[in-house]
């Protein structure tokens, strides 16, 4: 399997490049933020306070995430349900920010992201993707940009 990691600072255009490149190559683009949103959604649906690290950690063994490319678009599945639209609600974004602060969630998603890279051709972007998440990526790109036109 081929894995491409795009690292760089906020605002450098990582996501725009990653989505376009994944589409051109026919690879799955892994939106790591959507994964955090999915865990936030699960916590909200379970009635768990997303700020409660222990309660959220107790949910993790019940969560199965999968990312699939359908008709050229990424879809994220939470325990078999396509939650691609549901995770975009404002309250779920707030829950995602809360769960992302928990080390157990970060470890869980790190394992999940690496598992995805072992099972399909993927392209991931974000901070620390090439150094922490996919240190052995087939291709690593560090993207920078300036505010100048």
Go through the PLM ranges and name each one:
Residues 6:
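Hydrophobic anchor at the beta1->P-loop junction of P-loop NTPases
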Residues 9:
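P-loop (Walker A) phosphate-binding loop of NTP-binding proteins
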Residues 12:
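ATP-binding Walker
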Residues 15:
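Walker A/P-loop
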Residues 22-31, 45-49:
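Post-Walker A helix-loop "phosphate-sensing" segment adjacent to the P-loop in P-loop NTPases
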Residues 34-121, 131-133, 148-149:
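ATP-dependent small-molecule kinase phosphotransfer cores
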Residues 135-149:
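Conserved phosphate-donor/acceptor-positioning beta-strand/loop module used by diverse small-molecule
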